[in-house]
């Protein structure tokens, strides 16, 4: 089952988010900070999260953040996080999360953006198989 997450799902999302952050090299994590981060995103309507389950076990999530297009005068969403526990990969959970997000936003947004590493061939193949296209623009970043 895959569904839109709400405040009651925070405890289920916390371990998934911590595993996801560990994958990206975050070694020291504070569970209270993670919980507060999720709480703020959900209660302040700053992100949309879908969670997927194997029976009653949470196995993955997708989190999207809003932005806007001045040209189209519509909201668009940035797919920032997609995580499925390793033992549940290649079983349709990531596709279910992606499908839920696409369906939810179909009439609510211009579209989606995402960024993945050029060397992440697994993710790139997944996104291509799910209808994503690389664009003709150069994407610049400036981080502190």
How would you describe each model-predicted region?
Residues 51, 57-66:
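Conserved beta-strand in the GNAT
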Residues 1-15:
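A short beta-loop-alpha structural element at the N-terminal edge
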Residues 17-39:
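Conserved GNAT-fold acetyl-CoA-binding loop/helix
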Residues 39-51, 78:
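A short helix-loop-beta-strand connector motif used in the catalytic cores of GNAT acetyltransferases and
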């Amino acid at each position: 089952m895959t569904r839109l997450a709400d405040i009651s799902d925070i405890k289920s999302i916390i371990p998934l988010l911590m595993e996801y952050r560990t994958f990206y090299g975050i070694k020291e994590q504070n569970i209270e900070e993670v919980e507060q981060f999720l709480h703020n995103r959900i209660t302040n309507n700053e992100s949309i999260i879908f969670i997927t389950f194997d029976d009653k076990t949470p196995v993955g999530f997708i989190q999207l953040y809003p932005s806007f297009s001045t040209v189209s005068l519509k909201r668009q969403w940035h797919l920032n996080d997609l995580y499925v526990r390793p033992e549940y990969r290649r079983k349709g959970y990531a596709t279910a999360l992606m499908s839920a997000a696409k369906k939810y936003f179909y009439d609510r947004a211009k579209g989606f953006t995402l960024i993945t590493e050029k060397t992440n061939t697994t993710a790139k193949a997944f996104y291509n198989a799910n209808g994503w296209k690389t664009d003709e623009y150069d994407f610049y970043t400036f981080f502190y």
